[in-house]
């Protein structure tokens, strides 16, 4: 996190994978189950009032992929960590449900 913070303060864009199981975070609903979810995006939003630009990869044939970049999701600094985290999980659920066969998890998110 320190490295992300250092780079962000220098004006770099940073990326986080929010679909990973974490040992620290908060429990937030993910496909109707409680799952520990990172609060790092919420912390950056609340501290720096930054935008979240959702990005994901989608297969378009057997060997090629497209990188999909969506419109920024904006939150106010006053939005709670819980709401930001839940809203990002909702976005992730919707994205997964578009093409569930393309989502790869090598871990149990709900453990």
Per-range role (PLM):
Residues 2-111:
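Non-catalytic C-terminal accessory region of glycerolipid acyltransferases
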